[in-house]
């Protein structure tokens, strides 16, 4: 076998040349950390269909949060497919503690809610067994885009009357 290493930007590529050509297919399971932001962004769309969804606890919690907000969720668990519909013009802009406390990804609905409805109230997240994971980078970015943000009684209260710009 011959190994060649190429430096490509910050990523590396490993090229392997062997005596036999490799053929076939492999199944790559879905990623929770890729799916959660996509789910949060469905607040901005009218209809979304996602394939290869990993049905794990944080995904189920995010789906409960989206249902609470007002999005219809249809699961096809045997095929790892999700269908989401956002038919309401007015939806709930609150992400309550009971749903956000078990996963830090709940803060991801803040941007889409602000974008679409110009206001949001999202509980400070929990759910991390390895220590506190601050949301200050999210808040910093939203402030730079024009949001007014305050923390009160365990909630992030955000407003962007003129919308988010940037």
Positions of PLM-derived features:
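Structural preference for solvent-exposed beta-strand-turn elements
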Residues: 7-166
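Extreme N-terminal basic, low-complexity initiation segments
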Residues: 2-6
